[in-house]
Amino acid sequence: MDDDYTRGTRSLPLLEGGFDGRIGLTFLGVGGWLIETPRTQVLTAPLFSNPSIWRTGLGTIRADSTAIVDGLRRFGVDDLSGVTAILSGHAHYDHLMDVPWIAARLSPRARVLVNTTGQRTLAPIADSLGLDRSRIVDVSSFAADVEGGGTWIRLGPDVRLLPLRSDHAPHFAGLTLYDGTRGSDLVRPPRSAEEWLEGETLAFLLEVADAGGGRPVRIYVQDAVAREPWGFVPPRYAPVDLAILVPATYAEVDWHPEAILENTRARHVALGHWENFFAPPSADPEPVAFTLLPDFIARLRRAVSGDDSRWTLPMPGTRLELGRLRNDSR
């Protein structure tokens, strides 16, 4: 199993056409990815505060600014000031708890794109941090599904985003923790994990424009394992070049990752949110509990016909660089 992990930098020859430079993705652990295109930076919601399982279940939890700064530095990121958007498809604490502090202190240009419940949960935290509430945007009404629809959101000169209606698999034995939606703004910051209600989960499709006018690069971001067809892309947007998929809780639904791979026809798969987030951030973490990661990898291998060049299991801090196809001489 240890041989399956990727560390350092991995180059993926996926790009066609006239891209000026590479598209880089740095895995920050849990759901966090820093996605850098030639002209735009986007962050998917990271977690560095990592309260213990006992504190999460029984105590008070909050963002730890020291852990956030140390975690970013540990994984090679020292500047988030250029980030224009922070994405979180649902509002559980392990996705959203650290985001307001990052937006307020490290990413002053970023909009926080969340579901309705996420916006309502973050409202009092934004006030406590001096973060303008207008920067927290509910994108639920922009979402597409497998039948189509939806509205693209511009994130930068070369990047646009399509939210996708998705789902959150049960955590174990058919039970989904912290399920539910929020009908109005919280009046004070959440104190416990159970106050970070999930809301209606979204996935995301990013399109990076080709400077040469060719086909855009498409990156699919799965926020949580979903029952099919939730989280599917409309067929006209397949294939995607890179799909970021979640192994955690895969056994709670049928046909994951097979169904989403059939839908997206992804050329490459990167795995996130696979590690134990009840321990402090580490460059060499253990897999999350209740997930048989070797079994998931075996299923993924079968789904890509045994081609190990088509998937990456990154350790936190790993950087993926999407470059030109080897037969593209331009």
List the model feature ranges, each with a label.
Residues R111, Q119, A123-L155, P257-R330:
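Binuclear metal-ion centers of metallo-dependent hydrolases, dominated by the metallo-beta-lactamase
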Residues G17-L25, E36-V42, T151-L162, V208-I219, ...:
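Beta-strand-turn-beta hairpins that frame and shape the catalytic cleft
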Residues H95-M97, L122, W230, A251-W255, ...:
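Extracytoplasmic/secreted cell-surface and envelope-processing proteins
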Residues L43-A45, G82-H92, L113-T116, I219-V225, ...:
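Active-site neighborhood of phospho(di)ester-bond hydrolases with catalytic His/Asp-centered motifs
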Residues M1-F19:
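Short, Gly/Pro- and small/polar-rich lid/capping loops
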Residues S11-E16, R39-S88, H92, M97-A104, ...:
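Pre-active-site segment of Zn-dependent metallo-hydrolases
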Residues I53, R73-W152, R160, R165-G174:
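Active-site HxH/HxHxD metal-binding segment of metal-dependent hydrolases
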Residues R188-N263:
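Active-site-proximal loop/helix segments of hydrolase catalytic cores
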